[in-house]
């Protein structure tokens, strides 16, 4: 398919719009749940946490090869690079990584290592759906201006709304998953266009 000059530009607003729409839907649904159920469950009842010490990467220079283990941070960068260290890799399944100082968090469903001890690794207790808690934490827009650890003293005691029926939670999480998949498809399409553009430009004057 021929590329028009504006193909990539058209994709970027679409992705931004999808993300904004996802956030709006999430906030609407969680506000409705909170209004109906009230603040009825503590984070400490829902999540276990693990210190990341054993999963901290030894090397400070990372690789670009995606075949190796990603090194993660909870901030916007998320994947800092990759390591070929074959030991002490977190591979216990889905978790939330939360920066104890900035309160940034990410939902992770692949094996990884981390950069620093500032991370808390959070996993669900019993039949709690982790995706729901992750979305709720983002819904709260957690922010801090204090350089200290927050999770144990402030986040764990926090009350949030959690439906009595897991069916309602599953419906909410499924909705979030559908938006994620749509955004992922559009992102892949954008990357494909960029690769095609770069290829054409590199061969234009050969």
Q: Whereabouts are the PLM-identified features?
A:
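Amphipathic alpha-helical segments
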Residues: 1-31, 35, 159-201
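Non-catalytic DNA-recognition/assembly elements of restriction-modification systems
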Residues: 16-77, 185-195
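DNA target-recognition domains and sequence-specific DNA-contacting regions of bacterial/archaeal
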Residues: 42-163
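Short hydrophobic/aromatic patches at helix-to-coil boundaries
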Residues: 203-206
């Amino acid at each position: 398919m021929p590329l028009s000059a504006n193909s990539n530009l058209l994709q970027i607003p679409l992705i931004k719009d999808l993300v904004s729409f996802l956030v709006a839907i999430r906030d609407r649904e969680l506000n409705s749940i909170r209004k109906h159920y009230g603040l009825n469950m503590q984070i400490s009842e829902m999540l276990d946490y693990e210190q990341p010490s054993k999963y901290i990467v030894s090397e400070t220079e990372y690789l670009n090869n995606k075949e190796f283990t990603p090194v993660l941070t909870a901030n916007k960068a998320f994947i800092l690079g990759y390591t070929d260290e074959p030991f002490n890799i977190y591979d216990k399944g889905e978790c939330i990584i939360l920066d104890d100082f900035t309160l940034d968090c990410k939902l992770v469903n692949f094996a990884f290592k981390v950069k620093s001890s500032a991370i808390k690794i959070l996993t669900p207790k019993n039949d709690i759906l982790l995706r729901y808690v992750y979305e709720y934490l983002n819904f709260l827009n957690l922010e801090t201006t204090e350089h200290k650890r927050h999770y144990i003293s402030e986040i764990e005691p926090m009350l949030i709304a959690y439906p009595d029926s897991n069916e309602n939670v599953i419906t909410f999480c499924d909705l979030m998953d559908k938006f994620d998949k749509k955004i992922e498809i559009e992102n892949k399409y954008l990357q494909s266009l960029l690769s095609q553009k770069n290829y054409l430009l590199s061969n234009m004057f050969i």
